[in-house]
UniProtKB/Swiss-Prot annotation:
Disulfide bonds join C235-C266, C245-C256. Its main location: mitochondrion. The keyword Phosphoprotein applies. Residues 232-273 form the CHCH domain. A motif (Cx9C motif 1) lies at residues 235-245. GO terms for cellular component: cytosol; MICOS complex; mitochondrial inner membrane; mitochondrion. The modification Phosphoserine is found at S13, S31, S33. Component of the mitochondrial contact site and cristae organizing system (MICOS) complex, composed of at least MICOS10/MIC10, CHCHD3/MIC19, CHCHD6/MIC25, APOOL/MIC27, IMMT/MIC60, APOO/MIC23/MIC26 and MICOS13/MIC13. This complex was also known under the names MINOS or MitOS complex. The MICOS complex associates with mitochondrial outer membrane proteins SAMM50, MTX1 and MTX2 (together described as components of the mitochondrial outer membrane sorting assembly machinery (SAM) complex) and DNAJC11, mitochondrial inner membrane protein TMEM11 and with HSPA9. A lipid is attached at G2 (N-myristoyl glycine). This is MICOS complex subunit Mic25.
Length: 273
């Protein structure tokens, strides 16, 4: 286009106004229709989302995009669209790419952003699953270690318990034998004491019988040798008087002294006679 009317194509550059919109191409004023098209192209679609790292909030420096060589005819026609410079999306500003022969710069779309988010979620899920598996493995390892320690402790304490049990059984058997021996000794002594007691009782019975027999024989012999004799009391009258005097004079017993002297004289006389 324009090659038939212009024998030579020249390179052009663009300039921007305060709103960063292309207005001038090497001193050539753009038409209003071209400006409107650029406005329409620079508006982002409703379903389009900002891609992380490509918006204006990104702190990365914006690379300088060289302007491609565009052939411009010497006599521009108002109805013919003139090639425009790259839109703000090429410079890193938010917005979509314009449909036109401007540049071939590829910007990540919403689908690519969703893919990045999905991959990030998958990575997080994979990391979480790996951590969970690691925790489960650690728990299994700890449980196995505790089980091994318990089994080891049980195995170590089992011989001691067995030896202690054997010792207790031996001691119980020894004590049982000693108890049986003690019971047998007590039974033997009980039998011996009963025999001795029986013998002593028999001997005592024989002695009692013999002593009783001897006593009766001696009593019979004494009765046969000793003759009985009647004895009358001596001075019985004086005895009665003395007792009556003492009874009547409890606090004056000296009053009975004459009776006592008479009783003594009577007894002496009876002994002499």
């Amino acid at each position: 286009m324009g090659s038939a009317e212009s024998a030579e194509a020249r390179r052009v550059s663009f300039e921007m106004d305060e709103e960063e919109r292309v207005r001038v191409l090497q001193g050539i004023r753009l038409s209003e229709s071209v400006v409107n098209r650029m406005k329409d192209c620079s508006q982002p679609s409703a379903g389009e989302q900002l891609v992380p790292g490509f918006g204006p909030s990104s702190s990365a420096p914006v690379p300088t995009v060289p302007l491609p060589a565009i052939s411009v005819p010497t006599v521009p026609a108002p109805t013919t669209p003139v090639p425009t410079a790259p839109s703000s999306s090429v410079r890193g500003l938010p917005g979509g790419t314009c449909k036109g022969p401007l540049t071939d710069v590829k910007v990540p779309s919403a689908e690519s952003g969703g893919g990045l988010q999905s991959s990030a979620v998958k990575e997080d899920l994979k990391k979480f699953q790996q951590e969970q598996l690691a925790v489960q493995d650690e728990m299994v390892r700890v449980a196995k270690k505790e089980k091994e320690a318990a089994e080891k402790h049980l195995k170590a304490s089992l011989p001691k318990k067995k030896a202690s049990l054997t010792h207790e059984q031996q001691q119980s058997a020894r004590l049982a034998r000693e108890l049986e021996d003690r019971e047998a000794e007590l039974s033997r002594r009980d039998t011996f004491y009963k025999e001795q007691q029986g013998r002593i009782q028999e001997k005592n019975a024989e002695l009692y019988k013999l002593s009783s027999q001897q006593f009766h024989e001696a009593a019979s012999k004494a009765e046969s040798t000793i003759k009985p004799r009647r004895v009358e009391p001596v001075c019985s009258g004086l005895q009665a008087q003395i007792l009556r005097c003492y009874r009547d004079h409890l606090h004056e017993v000296l009053l009975c002294s004459d009776l006592v002297k008479a009783y003594q004289h009577c007894v002496s006389t009876a002994r002499k006679g």
